[in-house]
Regions:
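N-terminal redox-cofactor-binding region of secreted/periplasmic oxidoreductases
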Residues: 1-229
């Protein structure tokens, strides 16, 4: 990067939050945003040394390879834990556009409504379930369609598993026979029992915050208001 860069806002880290923040600040075309990311672009490029790492980001079955790839992962470790005999543990964090949303398992799982209400009771105003639900809905493009808990038209695509493996289906059926109820929506009003995960994927590929929110993915005039380094 050479020369002087002028920006109204500087965001350090183009991860799960950074991409969203850059997109929101640039929506009206009023502000120029500088988005800084220590890792590189998440998309495959002509750079062969980086091509495979970036390709695996977007292929769902390839996510496990990113968990040990220093090109897209900071490979942090925890402090020695007495509870596990003094061992340290790998703590994956994304080092790429999209951050950890570019290397996670793509599972779309909301917290229990009671947990959010508990935070509000402890004094966290604005964090009750009824306060956060509109933002869950605003962010979401639920392929099943909209309802009280879900919405369509948002940047984060949420889909059902494309390949219903028979062993997984047999496990859910076994749970049902054992008295563990089967339910239809992992993020529905009742979250006790066994069901299929939903995933942040679109057309069989990962939908990270870089894919969903980063303005450089957009053809709108606002995309020119965000500079990514």
């Amino acid at each position: 990067m050479t020369g002087i860069i002028e920006a109204d806002y500087v965001i350090v880290g183009a991860g799960s939050a950074g991409c969203v923040l850059a997109a929101r600040l640039s929506e009206g075309g009023k502000f120029k945003v500088l988005l800084l990311e220590a890792g590189g672009d998440d998309r495959p490029t002509k750079n062969l040394s980086q091509f495979a790492s970036n390709m695996m980001i977007h292929i769902p079955v390839g996510y496990s390879s990113t968990l040990k790839d220093p090109k897209v992962n900071w490979l942090f470790t925890t402090e020695p834990d007495p509870g596990t005999g003094g061992r340290t543990h790998v703590w994956p964090r994304g080092k790429v556009l999209g951050g950890s949303s570019s290397i996670n398992a793509m599972l779309y799982v909301r917290g229990q409504a009671a947990d959010y209400d508990g935070w509000r009771q402890l004094g966290c105003e604005g964090w009750a379930w009824d306060d956060v639900l509109p933002y869950f809905r605003k962010a979401q493009n639920q392929e099943r369609g909209g309802c009280d808990l879900h919405a369509t038209g948002g940047p984060l695509n949420v889909a059902d598993m494309r390949d219903a493996h028979p062993i997984s289906e047999a496990l859910i059926e076994a749970c049902d026979q054992a008295g563990i109820p089967r339910y239809a929506d992992l993020n529905g009003p009742d979250q006790e029992g066994a069901t299929w995960y939903q995933v942040t994927q679109k057309n069989g590929a990962r939908c990270s915050s870089a894919v969903g929110w980063a303005p450089l993915r957009s053809s709108s005039s606002n995309s020119s208001r965000v500079m990514v380094f």
